[in-house]
Amino acid sequence: MNFGPRPRNNRTIRQYNFALTGDIQTTLDNEKVARSFTLKLFEAEMAANDRVAVLFMPRSERLDSPFNINIAPGRRVTLPRGAEYDFLRYQVNWRTSNRRVVAFDGRYEAGDFYSGTRKEFVNNITFRILPGLFVYTAA
């Protein structure tokens, strides 16, 4: 479900976006394995095609097999089959237009991760050398 109003007579902001999406995964016996929702609390799309958004993402998961997680170099934890976990994650993402000579896109995400927490920062830089010729970097 998406709602995307366009402000009138605004030279800076082209459109606001608000959305709710959901996904439910089941086994062949119709037992729930995972349920996730993404609530886009706010997204602003600028006239120059730049964007910024804030998302809220609750998720529920029941492991159908043991799951190994690396918690540090050389240290692993195995989560048992059948264990159930509820996550609540938040995300801020951004993107500038690829029409720019130097463009940025990325995200910061934080929140629950199985029996702990996780923070993730991703930022990519794109250089437009010539029209149609790009160099992409990722960090």
How would you describe each model-predicted region?
Residues 2-139:
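Exposed, low-structure sequence patches enriched in small/polar residues
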